[in-house]
């Protein structure tokens, strides 16, 4: 585990943890399933079933910007610094579209509890694929008599899905939004000077953020754990 002599050591050491910790904290509010019974007691398959799930994710995930800022500045390297500046600018910019894109979805469900949103989709069809509702499935005549509003809502919800998914790609530095760490320009971005476990923590945090983003997309748009049959 090499630590270059020219770095600002305290901030250099703390930056990987500040980057990875928010991503792992966000996993706490993801509902992985319905309740199970353990010793005759119902247990929810979510660590923290709070009533402001998406807001919690936005609030905590934005803290990783500080870790990236420290990493770029503390490395005392022009490539790392430029990578950190690029990453911070990109993350802050796309957080706006990330938050605004969820407003139509949350207005449809009228709540912020992710478990309740999944239960609502289990009863009335997925957000983007309302193939069933309380009157039956697409194979029932009663369904087609009471599904016009659901299919009309797909227009704004599909736009929300596209914007949200694109913003998740940008927030996690995936192609084609990999400007902060493009090797042809910035060598390795803000983790150029890092090695060993500190280097691994950056990537663990990045991939944990990808898992959280994917889980939120599935929870809000594709029914979470519910299959509808």
Where are these regions (language model features)?
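Selective transmembrane helix interface/packing segments
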Residues: 1-229
């Amino acid at each position: 585990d090499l630590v270059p002599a020219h770095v600002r050591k305290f901030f250099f050491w703390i930056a990987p943890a500040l980057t990875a910790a928010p991503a792992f904290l966000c996993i706490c509010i993801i509902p992985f399933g319905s309740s199970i019974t353990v010793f005759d007691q119902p247990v929810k398959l979510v660590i923290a079933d709070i009533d402001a799930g998406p807001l919690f994710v936005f609030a905590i995930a934005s803290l990783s910007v500080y870790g990236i800022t420290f990493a770029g500045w503390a490395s005392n390297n022009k490539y790392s610094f430029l990578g950190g500046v690029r990453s911070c600018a990109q993350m802050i910019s796309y957080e706006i579209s990330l938050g605004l894109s969820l407003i139509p979805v949350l207005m449809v469900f009228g709540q912020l509890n992710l478990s309740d949103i999944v239960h609502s989709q289990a009863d009335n069809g997925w957000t983007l694929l309302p193939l069933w509702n309380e009157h039956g499935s697409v194979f029932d005549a009663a369904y087609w008599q009471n599904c016009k509003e659901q299919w009309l809502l797909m227009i704004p919800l599909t736009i929300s899905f596209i914007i949200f998914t694109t913003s998740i790609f940008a927030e996690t530095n995936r192609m084609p939004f990999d400007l902060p760490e493009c090797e042809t320009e910035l060598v390795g971005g803000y983790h150029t000077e890092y090695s060993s476990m500190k280097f691994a923590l950056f990537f663990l945090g990045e991939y944990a953020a990808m898992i959280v983003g994917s889980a939120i997309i599935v929870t809000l748009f594709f029914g979470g754990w519910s299959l509808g049959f």
